[in-house]
C-alpha cells in the first residue's frame, strides 16, 4: 500500500515538473491534469487500485521529466500573448 | 599608513558607488525588462506586428503535439531505425514490432482489427485512396458515387477527377443545420452506385452526421460506405462496426499526433477491395507501397491510445470552454449566429457569423487570436466558404464567419481573452459600419434596392 505522504510528494513532483515547461499551454495543462488526476482518485481505497494509480502517475512523472529537458532546450522564441499581458 | 588610508578610501569609493550603481541598474533593468521585453516579444511577420504568440484557437486545422506523444516518438527515433519491412535482421524486427504495436493502438480506438489498418501519409491520401481506389477497382459494374456538398476538398476533388474519367457523382445537398437528409440519400442510391462517401465530423462547422443511420442505409442497399473521420477519431466515440463503414480515413495531427501520418481503415469482412494509388514493394497489404514512416506511425499510435484514455476528460473540459466562449460572445454582442447544428456537433468547434461586419477586416483585427474563417485550404481566398453556402447561409453572413477550434491545451483565460478581443473588434467595426447604423434605425437592409453608379 502506498502511503498518503508518498502520493502527496508524487503530486508535488509532477506539479513541479509541469511548472517548468516553457510553453504556456503545456504548463497550464499539466497543472490542471495533475490536480484533476489526483482529485479523481482521491477516494480510492482498494490497495491494488491505489498502487495502479500511483504507478501510472509515476510513469507520467518520468515522461514529464524526460520531455522537459527537450522542451527547455528549445524554448519558444517569443512568449505567448497570455504571458506578455500578465507581466 | 597613508597608503592604507588611500587604498581604503579607494576601496570605499569603488565599492560603495558601484554597489548602489549596480543596485540601481538592476532595478532599472528589471523595470525596463518588462517594457523592453514587451517590445522584444513582439513579432513582425507579414507586415503585422503582434505583441506575442497569438492564442491558438485553430484546433480543426491542426493540433500541437502532446508531450506524451513526443516522448513515445523520441524513444523510437533513436534506436528503431530499421526498415519495418526488413525481415532478415533485428533492426527490421524491432521497427516492425513498433509499427504493429501502433497498429493495435489505432485499431483499438476505432474498434477494428489491427489487420484492417493501412498506414498512409494522412487523411488526404486516405480519402483519395478510398474514393478513387474503390471506383477504379469496381469500374466495370459501378459507375456512380454519392457524396455531400460539405465534404472536405480532397474528397470533392477526387470525385471531380472521377467525373473526368466518366464516372457520375451525386453531390447531396445538406439541410440548413448541416446534416444530410437521409431520405435524399436513400433516393440517390442507384443499382450502379459504387460508393457513398460522407464525412463523420465536418471540419468547418463541426457537425456530426448520423453515422449509424447512414451506415444502415448503405448496408440495406449493399453499397460500400466511406467516411472521412479525420476530425472524429479520438474526439467522439468511433465504432466501425456500429457505423457499418467499409472504409474510414484518419489523421494523426488532428489528435495531438505528428503531421504526415494517417491511416485508412479497410474492412475485411465483408471484404472491400480497392486499387492502390502507390505501386511498389507491396507494403501494407499491397495497398500502400513505400517504407513505413516508423516514428510517425509510433506517434500516431501513442496519440490514439492517449486520445482513448483522455476522451471523456477532454470532452468535459472542451464543452465547458465552448459554452464559455459562446455565452461570452452572446452576452455582449447581438447578431451572432452559430453555423451548423448545435445539438449534433463536436464540442471543440464553434463556427460563428457576426452580422454587419466584414469578415476579412475582423480576421485582420484579430491578429492576436489564431483563428480562421473556415478550413485552412479556403481561408486564403476571399471567397466565402462553400460549406456555409451549402448550408444556405446568406452571402454576407458566410463572409463573416470565424471558426473557433478548442482543444486539450486551451485554457479558460485564453477563451476569456478571445471573447474580449473579438467583442472589441466587432464593436469597433460595427461602429464604422453604415449598415449597422441603418439596422439600428430599423431599416431592413435585405429590402434595400442598391442603385449602381
From Swiss-Prot, chain B:
In this UniProt entry, the residues modified to N6-(pyridoxal phosphate)lysine are 254
Q: Where does pyridoxal 5'-phosphate bind?
A: 123-124, 203, 231, 251-253, 291
Q: Which UniProt keywords apply?
A: Iron, Iron-sulfur, Metal-binding, Mitochondrion, Pyridoxal phosphate, Transferase, Transit peptide
Q: What is the purpose of this protein?
A: Catalyzes the removal of elemental sulfur from cysteine to produce alanine. Supplies the inorganic sulfur for iron-sulfur (Fe-S) clusters.
Mostly located where? mitochondrion
Briefly describe activity regulation: Threefold increase in the catalytic activity in the presence of FH (frataxin). 30-fold increase in the catalytic activity in the presence of SUFE1.
Catalysed reactions, as listed in the record: (sulfur carrier)-H + L-cysteine = (sulfur carrier)-SH + L-alanine
What family does the entry list? Belongs to the class-V pyridoxal-phosphate-dependent aminotransferase family. NifS/IscS subfamily.
Q: Under which name does UniProt file this protein?
A: Cysteine desulfurase, mitochondrial
| One cellular component (GO) term of this entry | plastid
State the EC number(s).
Answer: 2.8.1.7
Active-site residues, Swiss-Prot/TrEMBL: 377 (cysteine persulfide intermediate)
Q: Any idea where this protein resides?
A: Mitochondrion
Source domain of life: Eukaryota
Source organism per UniProt:
Arabidopsis thaliana (Mouse-ear cress)
**What are the binding positions for [2Fe-2S] cluster in this chain?**
377
Q: Name one GO biological process term.
A: iron-sulfur cluster assembly
Q: Where is the transit peptide?
A: 1-34
**Molecular function, one GO term:** ATP binding
Give the knockout phenotype: Lethal when homozygous.
Q: One Pfam annotation, family name?
A: Aminotran_5
Amino acid at each position: 500500500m502506498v502511503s498518503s505522504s508518498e502520493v502527496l510528494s508524487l503530486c508535488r513532483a509532477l506539479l513541479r515538473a509541469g511548472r517548468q515547461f516553457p510553453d504556456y499551454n503545456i504548463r497550464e495543462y499539466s497543472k490542471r491534469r495533475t490536480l484533476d488526476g489526483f482529485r479523481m482518485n482521491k477516494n480510492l481505497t482498494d490497495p491494488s487500485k491505489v498502487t495502479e494509480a500511483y504507478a501510472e502517475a509515476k510513469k507520467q512523472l518520468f515522461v514529464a521529466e524526460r520531455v522537459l529537458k527537450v522542451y527547455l532546450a528549445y524554448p519558444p522564441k517569443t512568449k505567448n500573448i497570455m504571458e506578455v499581458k500578465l507581466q | 599608513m597613508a597608503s592604507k588610508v588611500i587604498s581604503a578610501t579607494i576601496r570605499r569609493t569603488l565599492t560603495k558607488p558601484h554597489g548602489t550603481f549596480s543596485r540601481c541598474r538592476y532595478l532599472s533593468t528589471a523595470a525596463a525588462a518588462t517594457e523592453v521585453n514587451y517590445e522584444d516579444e513582439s513579432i513582425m511577420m507579414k507586415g503585422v506586428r503582434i505583441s506575442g504568440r497569438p492564442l491558438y484557437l485553430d484546433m480543426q486545422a491542426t493540433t500541437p503535439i502532446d508531450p506524451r506523444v513526443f516522448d513515445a516518438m523520441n524513444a523510437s527515433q533513436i534506436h528503431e531505425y530499421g526498415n519495418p519491412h526488413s525481415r532478415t535482421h533485428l533492426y527490421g524486427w524491432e521497427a516492425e514490432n513498433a509499427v504493429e504495436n501502433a497498429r493495435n493502438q489505432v485499431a483499438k480506438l476505432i474498434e477494428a482489427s489491427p489487420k484492417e489498418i493501412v498506414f498512409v501519409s494522412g487523411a488526404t491520401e486516405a480519402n483519395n485512396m478510398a474514393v478513387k481506389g474503390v471506383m477504379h477497382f469496381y469500374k466495370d459494374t459501378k459507375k456512380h458515387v454519392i457524396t455531400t456538398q460539405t465534404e472536405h476538398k480532397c474528397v470533392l476533388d477526387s470525385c471531380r477527377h472521377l467525373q473526368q474519367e466518366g464516372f457520375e457523382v451525386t453531390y447531396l445537398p445538406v439541410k440548413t443545420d448541416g446534416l444530410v437528409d437521409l431520405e435524399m440519400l436513400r433516393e440517390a442510391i442507384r443499382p450502379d452506385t459504387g460508393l457513398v462517401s460522407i464525412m463523420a465530423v465536418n471540419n468547418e462547422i463541426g457537425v456530426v452526421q448520423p453515422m449509424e443511420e447512414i451506415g444502415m442505409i448503405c448496408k440495406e442497399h449493399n453499397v460500400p460506405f466511406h467516411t472521412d473521420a479525420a476530425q472524429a477519431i479520438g474526439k467522439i466515440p468511433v465504432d466501425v462496426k456500429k457505423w457499418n463503414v467499409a472504409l474510414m480515413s484518419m489523421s494523426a495531427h488532428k489528435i495531438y499526433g505528428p503531421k504526415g501520418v494517417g491511416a485508412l481503415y479497410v474492412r475485411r469482412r465483408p471484404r472491400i477491395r480497392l486499387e492502390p494509388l502507390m505501386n511498389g514493394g507491396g507494403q501494407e497489404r499491397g495497398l500502400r507501397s513505400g517504407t513505413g514512416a516508423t516514428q510517425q506511425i509510433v506517434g500516431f499510435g501513442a496519440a490514439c491510445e492517449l486520445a482513448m484514455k483522455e476522451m471523456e476528460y477532454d470532452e468535459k473540459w472542451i464543452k465547458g470552454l465552448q459554452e464559455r466562449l459562446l455565452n461570452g460572445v452572446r452576452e455582449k454582442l447581438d447578431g451572432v449566429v452559430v453555423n451548423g447544428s448545435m445539438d449534433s456537433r463536436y464540442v471543440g468547434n464553434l463556427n460563428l457569423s457576426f452580422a454587419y461586419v466584414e469578415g476579412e477586416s475582423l480576421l485582420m483585427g484579430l491578429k492576436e487570436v489564431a483563428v480562421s474563417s473556415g478550413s485552412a485550404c479556403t481561408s486564403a481566398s476571399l471567397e466565402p466558404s462553400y460549406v456555409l453556402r451549402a448550408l444556405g447561409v446568406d452571402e454576407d453572413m458566410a463572409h463573416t464567419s470565424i471558426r473557433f477550434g478548442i482543444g486539450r491545451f486551451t485554457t479558460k483565460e485564453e477563451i476569456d481573452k478571445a471573447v474580449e478581443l473579438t467583442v472589441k473588434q466587432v464593436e469597433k467595426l460595427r461602429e464604422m459600419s453604415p449598415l449597422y447604423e441603418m439596422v439600428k434605425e430599423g431599416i431592413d437592409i435585405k429590402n434595400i434596392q442598391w442603385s449602381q453608379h
